């Protein structure tokens, strides 16, 4: 009787052991791909958190001003910029957030070069320029988003972030205690049990405790990705133009086109929506239509001072003001957490004004956002460390923790790998009777929810079946 009752227990123990090692193998192979990207994202993200501080340190002489009682009208500052840079088009005005910092005007030329012109608001004098292409933030943001190789880099990062969620789910399964051995290290750091146990405790407990934080960063980051972000969730959360725009005519210009370089200046849920057009142009103006980037402004258009007054009457304080880019273009005033204009996403606002009459064409606020758009608006503020100094410091701590989790994972593998052997040192593989249904369902859900990660998993499984298991040297090296 004892022997017969022991058989099911042994079989169940064998099944659980097989599942554990299978999960560990998935965790291991996903980690091989994800860890380099996790290190890159954490390092570049840490630098981007201090964009304002780095920029002020690099360009202190250009940006610093001495506060005075009277300010020069913004229209006069704009005219000074136009005269100083006749081959450039002024595209944006950003008022200084503090009294001792210069106002900024963004300018672009026909070749696409983009500069920031710093203007003393008290004297109206140009203090200097900042080349957007020379910005440390722009460089870090481009690496963070595309690895400097465009769409290919974007896709690789999206695969890494998607597999990062698989890494997280499998890691949680491995972390939850199931026997005395796993309970011994649960929520404990054992410093006296050797380097491998120490690395394991740091890796598992940090990863487990910060799993929700990591998931938040992965999801909010994926929302910018080219497939899951732009083609799926962003497309479904972009405003249908008829909802807010009504019968107002649309241009071919989207809100995303208003961004400068790698900077995300417009709200995420508006990026794919078209910008409305100005239609209140007086009939007597017979000026020829001009190309967007060559547009120098219409004599009948309202001055920038008029638009600023209207924006302030709506409640705008910190904001970016985008100038019309054609005779049918509009003045756009945007204050949003994604662009770093404000820290409270509930105060997000984007307003479009007819450049001739000043009529408010579109006014989009937090209340108009979808549920996921609200998550993005709030999430991006936290993601970028814009809410407070504490938020910024906390994000640095999180980045350092993610780096430590990645490094301890590599060290664990290095310690346990077979020495003097041409093998990868993957966790052992055990035969299993039947299919682990919960694991299969979880994997299918992740593949469907994050298609780039799913595509990568399908390719790996195909290679494993077609090549790795058929070539003995590869089979030995990878197992």
Question: Where are the regions a protein language model picked out?
Answer:
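Conserved histidines in hydrophobic membrane contexts and catalytic metal-binding motifs
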Residues: 2-479
